[in-house]
Amino acid sequence: MSRVLVLAGGSPHAHDFAASGDALATLAYSQGHEAARAVHPDDAASALDGGSFDALVVAGLWWRMHGAAYDAWRADWAYDTPAAIRAVIASFVRSGGGLVALHTAPICFDDWPEWHDVVGGAWRWGTSSHPPYGTVTAAIVAPEHPVMAGVREHIELRDEVYGGLDVRVDVHVLATARRTPDDADQPVVWAHTFGTGRVVYDCFGHDSASIAHPHNAAIIANALAWVTERA
């Protein structure tokens, strides 16, 4: 049985991360994993430093909250990533721990450039964007990959498409979607390795309904299985 740590929390201005964390822990448990919860990176780093987890799932938003749009939230929720937290998380994945990063992960830890190497991509203010929450259709472009085993050719759910991300050239894109009908295809699910750790990023997972949706739940379940097999 693999042990999975679900880190879900951070700024609640647009997401119910507590509900998302519950949904992810429930999904992990349903797939035969032992799941534990953390709501803050400090707690996650302490747990990971103990050496008993096989994978980390990140569904949260810890960032510096630059910009006037976040003035009301910044005092309570702005986050600078301590060096000790960076070292533990990077070492965990680099040395073979798995990572499943959802939705807002490319925005997280925006003061820590290496995090975006770990995830495989980054949100770039002024370039990246997403349309309003709504119905999304994604195309599976790498059906042969274990993360897409048993997933239908096109999936549909209610979520957001993040586009214009700064994506590493060495990731294996598994699914694409468009923000608008005339948009270019945007990578929305990818896999890669960081050190000896396996990583999957899933753009979807805005809320617990998206996580529990059969199409997305299948991807997350497969991702957990893949990242907990040592590369």
Q: What are the residue ranges of the model-derived segments?
A:
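Short histidine/acidic/glycine/proline-rich micro-motifs that form metal-
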Residues: G10-A14, A105-C108, H206-S210
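Cell-envelope and extracellular/periplasmic
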Residues: G9, G60-L61
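Aromatic-Pro/Gly-enriched surface loop or interdomain linker
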Residues: M1-F53
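A glycine-rich, often tryptophan-bearing local segment used as a flexible ligand/cofactor-contacting loop or short
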Residues: W63-A149
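A glycine-centered loop/beta-turn motif at secondary-structure junctions
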Residues: R3-V4, A8, D166-A231
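Catalytic beta-strand/loop cores that center a nucleophilic Ser/Cys/Thr
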Residues: A28-Y29, D117-G195
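Structural motif
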Residues: A55-A59, Y201
